[in-house]
Amino acid sequence: MPELRRDPVVGRWVIISTERSRRPSDFASAPVLPRNSGPCTFCPGQESRTPGEVLAVRIPGSAPNGPGWDLRVVPNKFPALRIEGELEPAGEGVYDRMNGIGAHEVIIETPDHGASLASLPETQVVAVLEAWRQRMLDLQKDARFEYVSVFKNHGEAAGASLEHPHSQLIATPIVPMMVEQELEGALRHFRMRKRCIWCDIIRQEMQGRARGLGRLILGEGGFVALCPYAPRFPFETWILPEGHRSSYEDALGTDRRALARVLGEVLRRMNQVLGAPAWNLSLHSAPLKTPTLDHFHWHLEIIPKLTQVAGFEWGTGFFINPTPPEEAARYLRAGVPTAT
């Protein structure tokens, strides 16, 4: 029997279509493999092909914007928003507009063209996580910006135009609608119960694990990875700090090391179970001007590209998920592919 489930944060309903239930081996897609060995725009020796770096982790003595780096952050050569100028908001009847002001940056995660977050050493993943944090803290100083979205597209099917390992961030003068919905839903829960909804979710999932019923994948070093109760997509996974933290920027050094371990392990298990799929990652953190909130809890969302969003989803807002999260979590806990 199919089941309708309601997301406890934003109130979105999804259809868990058990009659279409699919195992990992049913999601036939080409694994994400290097298409070429480089050199590409992001490879060492090609630094002149990118805008000047705004942050870099370098070998001592190496010159900026040249070889000798472990990580670089550069403005996007083809930005979605421009950093120069003022917002100048205006209206025309019911229509609102403002200038397309923002920041769009690329985090080049490693010199190794053929690597991935799943294969990088923990220390390098920590460097990536710290680069996200440093850039968020710097962009927070710009009074025009309300939010910084950090995201990663892994694989062509996930929207990656270049295969060299990289993530991106976009600072916007508006808090994104999806984050606004999370903020509003979390505030409703907090006003009723005086508790953070994500803290309650973590608590309930950890209790479920003790009974062998949960959607928890793993927990380590103060972080948990879980498949949410009402996932939009098969094998959708969240990573959250166990303790209440509303802003990613507040993450301590020990937090980033633990997060690097959990993130790397989740991605490796997805590769094992799902055959190295394409995926999207997004960071949800508190808005820049309200970094400390009792009702919001920062988290990562990882969505493997296993199904297509089609007419019903676009027309209704309902998502049809053929894999119950309990099954997805069970496969990811085992971390081994299921035979056909």
Where are these regions (language model features)?
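Active-site microenvironments that recognize anionic phosphate/pyrophosphate groups
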Residues: 1-164, 170-246, 254, 267-272, ...
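Gly/Ser/Thr-rich active-site loops/lids in small-molecule metabolic enzymes
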Residues: 249, 253-262
